[in-house]
């Protein structure tokens, strides 16, 4: 048996399950799942500003024979045994403001801002209790966790839309053009600044970093490490604004993503015999800005900074001086100089541009052909590097949609 999970006899399930959906967020009734604390007094601590507890065998003399050590980290006889209990730590709230306006006929404007805050002990970063416990980013170990920023919260989001309708009649039949532009802006993710290795010796690489306020609070292995570290700190807004503090889990935010989507919708009213029909043709470009610049409308990643793990714990000064020493972690042999830099590729369906065309009538709504799907299927692959690639793909979408839509209309009229 690799793990044992025990429930406290008084444990209760949350009264409400949490979810986020634009302006509606329901928070758990202060009842998140966490592990019970294993109390042990007399723990040694590091010297200096970062004075977290030390579990390492090589740094801590063990007078308590009830605690065993294996290798270089603390090891209890009840391996991987966790106890589930309730906690009252944590809270959450959402505030939203939406403004709608119609300054002139047929012009619709909308602007909305949503702020969400959520603090919790655990966002359940694992598939079972033991992996969840091991996945917590902490200072003094996973048994000592305070409420911290929710792993999946989006603190700030702005959405807006502009819509304009141009109606006209032709031979007594209504025609109309709808032009719509949609905007969404948000930070694409929350990250934690942690050390690259296990500093406190508890056997888990989840130690949150201490952000020194100046050179007096941190010791480096080399002068080059020191210079590279402070250069990195000054370019990162979170590190620069939280000097002298421990990094909070998931509190560092990725740069904002600004995305625009465009829709053109045409209304066609026509008669077949004595029956009047309405036909709509919609043309959508998702993430239209990405057609202009490949770096627009997509999120950045933190691969260039080793996923925000920039400091490596190198040990202490001596057996009698438990002052930690660090080095600056190198990515591909070079010191990182940016936190976020590598753009996600167009393989990410949620980020790249796509075009879709949809036909619908008052009897049938059918056909949605996406340019993005054609890329996956390899259509027009011989023209992919051609400047006409986009227009070929668009022509294919429109013609296929119209033909399929008209055929569907014919079948509906004939009763097939």
Give short role names for the model-derived ranges.
Residues 4-174, 178-187, 406:
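Gram-negative outer-membrane beta-barrel transporters
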Residues 6-25, 86, 114, 118-137, ...:
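Primarily recognizes Gram-negative and organellar outer-membrane beta-barrels
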Residues 93-97, 156-162, 258-264, 351-357:
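Hydrophobic, lipid-facing positions within transmembrane beta-strands of outer-membrane proteins
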Residues 106, 167-176, 269-281, 363-376:
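Short loop/turn motifs that connect adjacent beta-strands in outer-membrane beta-barrel proteins
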Residues 178-275, 280, 305-355:
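Extracytoplasmic gating/loop element in the C-terminal half of outer-membrane beta-barrel translocons
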Residues 347-371, 375, 390, 394:
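Outer-membrane beta-barrel "beta-signal"
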């Amino acid at each position: 048996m690799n793990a044992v999970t025990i429930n406290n006899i008084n444990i209760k399930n949350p009264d409400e399950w949490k979810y986020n959906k634009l302006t509606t967020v329901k928070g758990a009734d202060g009842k998140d799942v966490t592990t019970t604390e294993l109390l042990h007094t007399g723990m040694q601590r590091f010297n200096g500003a970062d004075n977290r507890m030390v579990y390492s065998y090589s740094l801590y003399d063990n007078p308590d024979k009830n605690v065993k050590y294996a290798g270089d980290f603390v090891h209890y006889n009840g391996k991987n045994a966790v106890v589930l209990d309730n906690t009252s730590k944590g809270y959450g709230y959402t505030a939203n403001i939406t403004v709608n306006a119609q300054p002139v006929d047929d012009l619709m404007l909308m602007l909305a801002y949503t702020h969400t805050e959520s603090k919790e002990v655990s966002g359940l970063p694992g598939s079972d209790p033991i992996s969840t416990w091991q996945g917590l980013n902490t200072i003094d170990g996973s048994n000592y966790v305070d409420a911290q920023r929710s792993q999946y919260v989006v603190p700030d989001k702005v959405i807006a839309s502009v819509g304009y309708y141009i109606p006209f009649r032709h031979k007594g039949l209504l025609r109309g053009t709808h032009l719509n532009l949609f905007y969404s802006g948000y930070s694409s993710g929350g990250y934690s600044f942690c050390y690259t290795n296990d500093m406190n010796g508890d056997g888990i690489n989840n130690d949150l970093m201490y952000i020194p306020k100046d050179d007096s609070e941190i010791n480096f292995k080399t002068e080059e490490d020191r210079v590279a570290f402070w250069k990195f700190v000054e370019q990162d807004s979170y590190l620069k604004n939280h000097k002298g503090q421990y990094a909070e889990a998931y509190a560092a935010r990725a740069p904002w993503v600004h995305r625009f989507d465009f829709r053109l919708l045409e209304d066609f009213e026509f008669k077949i015999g004595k029956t009047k029909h309405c036909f709509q043709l919609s043309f959508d470009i998702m993430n239209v800005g990405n057609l202009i610049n490949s770096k627009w409308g997509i999120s950045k990643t933190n691969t260039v900074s080793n996923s925000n793990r920039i400091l490596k714990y190198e040990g202490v000064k001596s057996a009698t001086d438990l002052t930690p020493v660090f080095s600056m972690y190198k990515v591909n042999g070079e010191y990182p100089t940016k936190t976020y830099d590598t753009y996600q590729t167009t393989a990410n369906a949620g980020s790249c541009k796509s075009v879709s065309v949809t036909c619908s009538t008052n009897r049938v709504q059918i056909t949605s052909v996406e340019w993005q799907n054609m890329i996956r299927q390899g259509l027009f692959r011989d023209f992919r590097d051609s400047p006409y690639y986009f227009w070929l793909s668009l022509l294919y979408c429109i013609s296929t949609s119209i033909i399929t839509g008209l055929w569907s209309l014919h079948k509906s009229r004939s009763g097939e």
